[in-house]
């Protein structure tokens, strides 16, 4: 089963400095049929104006993954971490017992991100933050794991959840496959381009909610960049 969730039907909040679309219930947007997708709780599509951002605010017991689509985001937190994550790269924050952080677009242009929240396997762990650049060429034509709860994914950023975040870039006409074990779900969003997944078409920034599909064949109808989250 693959359900398409068109971009123009997502939850929407425009605060001037922040133009946000919500794939799942978030803040003032509530849809009882879109509370979560397995352990995936939030997928926000955020456009952050130059010189603005999120002032210090707290989180607790959530795995928060930020994928930068365009521009860069600068993070600072109560643990003393500070870092800048650029387009195509990922940062992970395990909120654990509690962390206060800020995220600002210090660039001269709009920054566009996907922010993803995944429910952790357990509560009350120590908070932490990490960021990592990923060579863009490695994901040409094949899925590359960016963040994972599997210790064997040693090249990926670690998250404390039974989940995986992967990305692929495809030229028009090119395909890549992703295998899902029995009972697991996936959620895909083409950051750019247009794709077809097992016969279901999605345009840029649409969501595809997937379950009961052992193999996903992702075909680019035009040059595309795709982000996928696999969860229990």
Curated annotation (Swiss-Prot):
Pathway annotation: Flavonoid metabolism; quercetin degradation
Catalytic activity of the protein: quercetin + O2 = 2-(3,4-dihydroxybenzoyloxy)-4,6-dihydroxybenzoate + CO
EC code(s) of this entry: 1.13.11.24
Native source species: Pseudomonas aeruginosa (strain ATCC 15692 / DSM 22644 / CIP 104116 / JCM 14847 / LMG 12228 / 1C / PRS 101 / PAO1)
Listed Pfam families: Pirin (PF02678), Pirin_C_2 (PF17954)
Keyword check for Oxidoreductase: yes
Molecular function via GO: metal ion binding; quercetin 2,3-dioxygenase activity
Family label: Belongs to the pirin family.
Presence of the UniProt keyword Transferase in the record: no
InterPro entries (alphabetical): Pirin, Pirin_N_dom, Quercetinase_C, RmlC-like_jellyroll, RmlC_Cupin_sf
Cofactor note: Binds 1 divalent metal cation.
CDD domains registered for this protein in UniProt: cupin_Yhhw_N
Protein name listed in UniProt: Putative quercetin 2,3-dioxygenase PA1210
Alphabetized UniProt keyword annotations: Dioxygenase, Metal-binding, Oxidoreductase
Domain of life, source organism: Bacteria
Cofactor(s) required for function per UniProt: a divalent metal cation
Record: residues binding a divalent metal cation: 57, 59, 101, 103
Lineage start: Bacteria, Pseudomonadati, Pseudomonadota, Gammaproteobacteria, Pseudomonadales
Function: Putative quercetin 2,3-dioxygenase.
């Amino acid at each position: 089963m693959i359900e398409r969730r068109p971009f123009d039907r997502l939850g929407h909040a425009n605060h001037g400095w922040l133009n946000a679309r919500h794939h799942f219930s978030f803040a003032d947007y509530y849809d009882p049929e879109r509370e979560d997708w397995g352990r995936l709780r939030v997928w926000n599509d955020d456009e952050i104006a130059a010189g603005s951002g999120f002032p210090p605010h707290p989180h607790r017991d959530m795995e928060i993954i930020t994928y930068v689509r365009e521009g860069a985001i600068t993070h600072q937190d109560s643990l003393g971490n500070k870092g800048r994550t650029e387009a195509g790269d990922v940062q992970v924050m395990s909120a654990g017992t509690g962390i206060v952080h800020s995220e600002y677009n210090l660039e001269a242009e709009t920054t566009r991100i996907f922010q993803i929240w995944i429910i952790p396997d357990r509560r009350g762990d120590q908070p932490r933050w990490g960021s990592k650049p990923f060579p863009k060429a490695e994901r040409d034509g094949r899925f590359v794991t960016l963040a994972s709860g599997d210790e064997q994914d040693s090249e990926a950023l670690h998250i404390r959840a039974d989940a995986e975040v992967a990305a692929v870039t495809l030229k028009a006409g090119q395909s890549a496959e992703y295998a899902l074990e029995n009972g697991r779900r996936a959620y895909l969003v083409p950051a750019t381009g247009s794709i077809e997944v097992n016969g279901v078409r999605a345009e840029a920034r649409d969501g595809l909610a997937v379950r009961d599909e052992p193999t996903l064949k992702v075909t680019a109808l035009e040059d595309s960049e795709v982000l996928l989250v696999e969860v229990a």
